């Protein structure tokens, strides 16, 4: 309570129930008397928790509110005091019923002087003499209380129920109206302050239902209507329709307060009854957010014919209906507040939506000016305006919300629509906000307009998020929660949102694509939707890169990683330096790590990679395949001499030539081919010297010559991990194969060393012992099963096979071989998945057949687990005889065995093997359908691996310490010892400087990192702007083409109708009953039928109507009268009324406009209106 900042930091708690001391006050106020206390709360608190005044209780010698001033001689006074204390202790909000607190936080209108004088007289009767401090505070609180809070002497019970104003005789209409307005004003003042304490203290189920039953009558009396209520599916509490969304969003955030006990409430009532004062408690109903409350102003009664007037575009009728509805409802500025039913609220919403959808902007302005729509109606109207692509209407709606400063819409409140069940009937899916819809439709103008107003799309929480918002949303409606996430991601992954809401649109597309790919794995039920959005992000990055216009922009885009991705795990190792003169290409390598195949396979990226790959060898790309093979063969033969030359002089002309990526690739490939040749040589030597290798007479070095290359490979992989980083190293599956191969080689070599060591140890002391003979001269037939040489030879055989398969790493350098290599990789994945099903079925039949034939042992291939497995395995390939399962002397086991063997053959050979073939074919076809992208992506990864600085010398020459390495080591030691300043530690640029917009050819060598980053962002924004302009031009062109197609169809329709109308005209002129031709259209048949139906009504038609014989295009409306009068003439519609419901539009020819063209009567009942 009384705690300074020093005490708070040191943990000295000075709170407690005690009297104030002089040390608790400041020095100027020490020793002085005081009659009031001012409390300042400086500790932070959340808006969802009750304001911390419930713990405050002040007592003094003059009296206390907790101990009412009662005559000591009165019976039961001690009991009243005790009960009153219990009330404050058990009441969850004792400070709300405190008159002093209510006077400070909830000021009310003044009461009448007569009531105050009566209360003052009662207080003097209770306490003769001058009034005490408690009596003065009660009197002051009564002055601020509403008239209904003071109980007359005739009614001293203070029971809850209707107030004195309600029980009295009804007054005139105008005073009642003023009283209602006063109550509304008091509610407006009280609600913001009341929300500090009870905005999030939501009741539990039992308490919530009890309070709702208590509050419903009061709400009904205040509003004058029935308030619709809904049940929260989370806590099962009843709340009004408007407060339910806000409650559901924060339900369960803080523990509900405990209600006061009945005994305490009764004692409190007795105390108030003794004072003859009843303070009306404020209803603690959770107040909704201002964004979801109805705008308090005049509410019009919905006219039934308004929708028809809007549909027909009759502006005057709409204004007349709104004015008449306003007069009929009496909802002027001073009129009573009337609840609007849900159906009527929906009608107003449909009226506004219809006006927007039909494009009647003037009618929309009239509705917005005369009708006060709440946030939900404006929200749906915005969606309709965005859906119909009307930026002007969107501006009007946003301006309407902007003018309501007191109820200004918070853009975060759009998420509360999830908990609003009143908009479930909307045509828009859950989670669709105006900005989300605009982005989904790629409406750049509307999206930019909404973003300028502060609208954003909040990124959904992770799938496994267990926060209060996500848990409440799942419990409220799981389907709406899932659809809301999908629709939100549709908006985020749209081209408009990526272009307008991201500073680096390309990087945002990469990161979002990776996130959507992960969500597709975590939420397989929505995998197709996530995969489609991920493909959309890849296409956006591909198209954005295509907006580059010069090499400077390409260099700026591909060479910078981006500040937002520097902390990403996939960006590890992307800051490494490349060879001298080779740009960093950090953005391109990030795209490779993010698996952006479309972006990497873009012609711009491939051109950059190909130019770096060839280096100064300009003629390499245009040379023939024979010449390339000849150069590769020369490098293969001279590989040792080239490596020695580079080792001696790395900065010479030969050294710079070997640093070119394509030559480095050929050099390393030649080294690996030499390694495979040595492996083949060792195998051939073992065949020629079989007697030597059959026993233990060979030495370790004779069988381990390949370990020279293995040592070089091990050092190469260590340097690669050091340069790239462990995570980036493990992202490549070929590195896993390298680790396995090296591990097996080292294990084989270690076993041979172990064998040699054991032979030396056992033969050192006793050379003629049995153990020494076993490890030196024993024959192979005498070796034990776990002999080290057995294991070493087996491991070496497996490793040799894997070493040859490692040669497939260089196949992506060729287009045809690279595509086959990718297809084989996909097929291996299919086979691994297929093996799970295969092993399940094979194990099932293995157990069944083995259990049948074990007791009989009639066959060598059945009855034993290992033999049965081999028999079934080779049966899949048709290499076993079916007579093996025969047992003539045992009919029942033989029948079951044959049946099981037949079923196994059908399932494995016919079903599963064909299914495997279909899977492999499908994978191969997928690669072939996108072979160009797949091959270019694989080739790009191969190219990038040879762009790095270092690793120029191939295996095994890289294990030799080079003079360059020694020079770098000495220079690093010298810098560490002699130059420890920060200037020496400054990192150089990883790529050459780039030009600027003003001078693309200039070298920005002196430009800082900030200028380079700024230039990159300017390039990205320029690309985005070009992309937006291109999208707009394509949209306009598509719309023009669509309009042209419609005009062409309209022209054909007019030509066809011309002939039909001419035929009708000829028949009418002949005066007979025309018969429609067989090929006549529906319109022609309809006109003919109308003429035949009314041929005997009205005056005759002239033989040659002037308007039908004039060529030209005119739109004619043919309508039937709604009824006939007594004379047989068609009844004309009254002015202002809509036309007939049955109408048809006919296009006829006209040569020139007829002045004052009016209605053309056909047979008196066929009415045509011509418009030029």
Swiss-Prot record:
Isoform 3 is ubiquitously expressed at low levels. Isoform 4 is expressed exclusively in vomeronasal organ. GO terms for molecular function: calmodulin binding; damaged DNA binding; diacylglycerol binding; inositol 1,4,5 trisphosphate binding; store-operated calcium channel activity. Gene3D superfamilies: Ankyrin repeat-containing domain, Galactose-binding domain-like. The chain crosses the membrane at residues 660-680, 703-723, 739-759, 790-810, 834-854, 900-920. InterPro entries: Ankyrin_rpt-contain_sf, Galactose-bd-like_sf, Ion_trans_dom, TRP_dom, TRPC2_channel, TRPC_channel, Xrcc1_N. Residues 75-87, 195-204 have a biased composition (Polar residues). Residues 1-22, 69-98, 140-227, 249-271, 1118-1172 are annotated as: Disordered. The keyword Zinc does not apply. This is Short transient receptor potential channel 2. It is found in: Membrane. It comes from the Eukaryota. The keyword Protein biosynthesis does not apply. Residues 261-270, 1130-1144 have a biased composition (Low complexity). Residues 1-659, 724-738, 811-833, 921-1172 are cytoplasmic. Residues 1-10, 166-177 have a biased composition (Basic and acidic residues). Thought to form a receptor-activated non-selective calcium permeant cation channel. Probably is operated by a phosphatidylinositol second messenger system activated by receptor tyrosine kinases or G-protein coupled receptors. May also be activated by intracellular calcium store depletion. Plays a role in mediating responsivity to pheromones that elicit aggressive and mating behaviors. Required for response to the Esp1 pheromone which enhances female sexual receptive behavior and to the Esp22 pheromone which inhibits adult male mating behavior. Residues 681-702, 760-789, 855-899 are extracellular. GO terms for cellular component: dendrite membrane; endomembrane system; endoplasmic reticulum membrane; Golgi membrane; nuclear envelope; nucleus; plasma membrane. ANK repeats lie at residues 301-330, 377-406, 430-459. Disulfide bonds: none annotated. Belongs to the transient receptor (TC 1.A.4) family. STrpC subfamily. TRPC2 sub-subfamily. Disruption phenotype: Reduced electrophysiological response to pheromone mixtures in the vomeronasal organ. Mutant males and nursing females are docile and fail to initiate aggressive attacks on intruder males. Males display normal mating behavior towards females but display increased sexual behavior towards prepubescent females even when presented simultaneously with adult estrus females and also show increased sexual behavior towards juvenile and adult males. Lack of response to Esp1. One of its GO terms (biological process) is mating behavior, sex discrimination. Keywords: ANK repeat, Calcium, Calcium channel, Calcium transport, Ion channel, Ion transport, Membrane, Repeat, Transmembrane, Transmembrane helix, Transport. Residues 206-218 have a biased composition (Basic residues).
